[in-house]
């Protein structure tokens, strides 16, 4: 390997073993990189975040001593090159010639994919200690930023598991617990989030700090070191189709060049490898987000090998050190490619950035509009993500009209109204590809890819899509938006964030109200109830002291609370500051016009939630983690995690809310189900997600909600219930002329009148239709849904709600079960005739819209139509609430997450029977 500087500590001197002989713990890695930063004049260490468990996240800036002394100038040069419009050709050439290229090398974002972090130690030591000329040259020409361990909390969980399962003799069986790990595994962070899907949702502190750090450097190369199945070999970029159309063509070309040069090194060593195959590049939420900002992004996927090695299918044993070496050699090869081609890559980077702001470029004539919302907390969260990525936006100072805007349903509006207060995000700016990737309503998928996907689906039911095909941020957040085919510039002003966390007081106040449109209002209510404050909720829009309040508004009524007003106000202020809500005092209890009065039926008294969350083996860790995180960070209240395996030995009377996340595998036992059923009947609110809900819908007599496939014998009854819901929402009476007639009418219309003419399918036909359509369910697409605006679960939720769905169970509800959210949005069309879609009928004068974004085959749209996504039903003194999927998917589906927040916090008071405690 050459000569090494003895003044730099060897890894073994700190770890106690050679790199690759064992798995280094997070504490060992942090100790070693900090020691190296102190010893070497070629490295600076930067702490960019802390994990939930308090572990430091660092990156090392590695370069020549000269470059490190000029880092401020280098960063300034990079900043100028990233915004080159004001630079002339000579200045650009001069900056490129004097600026080292940057590379960001990142490892082990999944904590149980360990070899990457260990290989980073080999890389760092080699760069700092080697005295070979090629390394010296590399550091003269490059600034190398190494993030050695992106998920220390997950790695800590993994290394602990390995220690616990290590035996006296080496174990090379990939099926053993030493290699597989155990639930909840080390993949995710403390809250079990997959951090590799968090690069633009930025839910976690690891991601927020990392994004901020990466973005200030604009690395020309970004490496992401992973592991895959134990019996695979080694994968690296480039990806195969589908490839996101917003990735610049030059990056695809450079990806191929880097791959050829890396492959040459592997060929010399006779190491197996491949590119493409399962690796596609449509979803922009991995570390590949850096591509949209100008980086060549290269994924490493090493076949997983825990410490003892793996016996492979050819009979050889692959050691852990080999796995570490593969990633080390890859890194050196890629860094040399960057050094070799850096000037040309820099030139392409600048050309691309220039094209993003060109008046006739690809992104010149498009803007995205976020329409005004009363949900200030959600809008602020959305804008924070734009700020984090350096995306510019403004606000309209007055209303205007734009031509040919497209809404979430894909409808083109010839003259669309853009109200005052709308957020305008022009696509023509330096981060144009990223803006387009995360805000465009539909990612383009070529006909060739669609054909291959269709063929694969029909052959064996599989997919060539690796992740979701929809991720539009406005849809994920449940914010109404428009795509406008023009560069909007009129009547724009800087956005001013509304006041938050304060109280607008008034003399002789009788109550304090927080508007229920804001998601933060739910956490505000939960925190107050945790402090034994009596809280009410407004079940209908209200108007007091000239202030309008949305349904779902939170009311602290002095009449209800025996606490001294000053002490009560202290608690209110603290909760307001913690959640960022604005509190308005009122001294008038009489509602204006026919709106609610403060002592009437629309002011419902809430019950403090006592929350339990089912956990342990078989539970989907991502669903569990996202709910756990939501309760901790948004509600800020105590709750308990219960092992479903020990449920029969527990006293469930302590809880009035139990949340059952979706499952990876297994089912609840019969005894667990019986226990939960009795608990519900005694007043509990049971909230069940995904596959867990599917199991309970299948249980005889547990729930009135059924699965679509089990209801075709009674399809007509479900269709009648559907019509009844629709008719109950109409704003006019169609047979008004017959109401006051004295003669009995003989020509009345009934819901089944249309059915007779349309000749719906019989049970056998419906079963065949369903069996065929099941094959085409999406792997992740955004669909339109309609919400029951009279139901308490939809507080803070708009009438039309985007839902990210996949092959989730489809629920059917009638009679005593409420379909709170159904798939499909009905829009008026006078020319539309009544249509039969599967089991259901679309009323005359209406079109039904399903697809918003992503790949949904027409067969799947039909199957989804009018099925229920969210149901609520009373059972005894309690209730059952079922979600068809994970409502807080990746912590980013804010629209559906609000439904879950409402269920958890408001359920005990609004959906279950409360008891007056004497």
Predicted regions and their residues:
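Intrinsic-disorder/low-complexity accessory segments
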Residues: 1-114, 123-131, 135-142, 197, ...
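Well-ordered mid-protein domain cores that form the structural environment of catalytic cofactors
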Residues: 86-90, 97-99, 154-157, 173-184, ...
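Active-site neighborhood of phospho(di)ester-bond hydrolases with catalytic His/Asp-centered motifs
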Residues: 106-107, 147-149, 222-225, 689
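Active/ligand-binding-proximal structured segments within catalytic/core domains
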Residues: 118-120
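Short, conserved secondary-structure transition motifs
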Residues: 139-158, 723-725
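Short, solvent-exposed turn/loop segments enriched in Gly/Ser/Thr/Pro and often Arg
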Residues: 149-152, 162, 225-232, 692-693
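Aromatic- and acidic-residue-enriched segments that line the glycan-binding/catalytic groove
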Residues: 156-172
């Amino acid at each position: 390997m050459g000569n090494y500087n003895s003044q730099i500590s060897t890894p073994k001197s700190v770890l106690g073993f050679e790199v690759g002989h064992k798995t280094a713990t997070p504490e060992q890695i942090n100790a070693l990189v900090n020691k190296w930063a102190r010893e070497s004049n070629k490295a600076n260490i930067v702490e960019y975040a802390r994990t939930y468990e308090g572990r430091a996240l660092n990156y090392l800036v590695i370069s020549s001593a000269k470059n490190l002394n000029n880092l401020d100038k280098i960063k300034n040069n990079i900043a100028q090159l990233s915004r080159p419009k004001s630079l002339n050709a000579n200045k650009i050439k001069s900056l490129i010639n004097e600026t080292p290229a940057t590379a960001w090398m990142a490892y082990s974002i999944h904590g149980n994919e360990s070899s990457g972090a260990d290989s980073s130690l080999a890389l760092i030591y080699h760069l700092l200690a080697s005295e070979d000329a090629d390394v010296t040259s590399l550091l003269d020409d490059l600034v190398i930023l190494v993030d050695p361990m992106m998920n220390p909390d997950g790695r800590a969980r993994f290394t602990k598991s390995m220690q616990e399962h290590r035996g006296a003799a080496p174990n090379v069986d990939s099926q053993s617990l030493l290699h597989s790990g155990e639930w909840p595994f080390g993949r995710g962070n403390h809250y079990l989030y997959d951090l590799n899907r968090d690069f633009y949702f930025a839910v976690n502190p690891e991601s927020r700090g990392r994004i901020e750090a990466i973005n200030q450097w604009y690395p020309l190369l970004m490496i992401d070191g992973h592991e895959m199945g134990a019996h695979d070999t080694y994968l690296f970029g480039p990806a195969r189709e589908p490839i996101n159309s917003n990735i610049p063509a030059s990056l695809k070309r450079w990806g191929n060049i880097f791959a050829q040069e890396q492959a040459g090194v592997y060929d010399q060593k006779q190491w197996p490898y491949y590119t493409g195959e399962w690796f596609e590049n449509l979803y922009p939420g991995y570390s590949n987000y850096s591509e949209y900002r100008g980086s060549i992004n290269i994924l490493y996927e090493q076949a997983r090998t825990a410490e003892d090695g793996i016996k492979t299918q050819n009979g050889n044993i692959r050691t852990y050190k080999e796995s570490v070496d593969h990633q080390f050699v890859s890194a050196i090869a890629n860094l040399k490619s960057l050094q070799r081609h850096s000037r040309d890559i820099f030139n392409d980077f600048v050309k691309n950035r220039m094209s993003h702001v060109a008046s006739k470029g690809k992104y010149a004539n498009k803007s995205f509009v976020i329409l005004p919302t009363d949900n200030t907390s959600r809008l602020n969260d959305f804008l924070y993500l734009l700020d984090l990525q350096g995306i510019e936006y403004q606000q309209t100072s007055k209303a205007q009209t734009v031509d040919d805007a497209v809404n979430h349903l894909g409808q083109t509006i010839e003259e669309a109204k853009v109200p005052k207060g709308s957020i305008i995000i022009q696509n023509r700016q330096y981060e144009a590809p990223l803006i387009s990737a995360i805000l465009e309503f539909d990612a383009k998928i070529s006909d060739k890819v669609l054909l291959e996907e269709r063929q694969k689906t029909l052959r064996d039911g599989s997919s060539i899509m690796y992740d979701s095909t929809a991720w539009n941020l406005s849809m994920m957040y449940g914010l109404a938006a428009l795509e406008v085919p023009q560069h909007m510039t009129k009547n724009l002003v800087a956005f001013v964030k509304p006041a938050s966390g304060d109280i607008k007081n008034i003399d002789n106040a009788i109550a304090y109200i927080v508007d229920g449109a804001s998601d933060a209002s739910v956490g505000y209510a939960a925190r107050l109830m945790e402090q034994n404050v009596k809280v009410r909720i407004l079940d209908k829009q209200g108007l007091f002291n000239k202030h309008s309040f949305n349904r779902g508004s939170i009311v602290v009524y002095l009449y209800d609370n025996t606490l001294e007003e000053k002490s009560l106000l202290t608690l209110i202020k603290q909760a307001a500051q913690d959640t960022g809500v604005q509190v308005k005092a009122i001294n008038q209890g009489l509602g204006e016009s026919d709106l609610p009065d403060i002592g009437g039926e629309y002011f419902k008294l809430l019950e403090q939630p006592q929350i339990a969350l089912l956990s342990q083996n078989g539970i989907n860790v991502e669903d569990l983690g996202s709910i756990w995180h939501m309760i901790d960070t948004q509600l800020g209240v105590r709750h308990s995690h219960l092992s479903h395996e020990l449920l029969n030995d527990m006293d469930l009377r302590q809880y009035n809310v139990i949340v059952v996340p979706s499952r990876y595998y297994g089912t609840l036992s019969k005894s667990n189900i019986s226990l939960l059923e009795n608990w519900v009947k005694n007043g509990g609110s049971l909230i069940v997600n995904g596959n867990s809900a599917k199991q309970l819908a299948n249980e005889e007599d547990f729930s009135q909600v059924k699965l679509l496939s089990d209801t075709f014998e009674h399809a007509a009854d479900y269709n009648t219930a559907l019509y009844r819901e629709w008719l109950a929402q109409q704003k006019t009476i169609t047979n008004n002329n017959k109401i006051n007639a004295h003669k009995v009418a003989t020509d009345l219309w009934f819901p089944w009148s249309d059915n007779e003419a349309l000749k719906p399918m019989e049970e056998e036909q419906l079963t065949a239709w369903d069996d065929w359509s099941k094959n085409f369910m999406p792997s992740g697409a955004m669909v339109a849904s309609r919400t029951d605006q009279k139901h308490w679960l939809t507080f803070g939720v708009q009438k039309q709600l985007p839902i990210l769905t996949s092959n989730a169970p489809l629920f059917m509800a009638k009679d005593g079960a409420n379909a709170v959210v159904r798939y499909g949005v009905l829009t008026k069309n006078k020319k539309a005739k009544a249509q039969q879609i599967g089991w259901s009928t679309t009323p005359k004068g209406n079109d039904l819209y399903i697809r918003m974004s992503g790949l949904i085959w027409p067969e799947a749209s039909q199957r989804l139509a009018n099925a229920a996504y969210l149901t609520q039903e009373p059972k005894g003194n309690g209730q059952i609430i079922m979600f068809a999927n994970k409502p807080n998917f990746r912590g980013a589906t804010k629209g559906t997450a609000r439904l879950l927040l409402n269920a958890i916090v408001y359920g005990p008071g609004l959906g279950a029977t409360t008891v007056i405690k004497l």
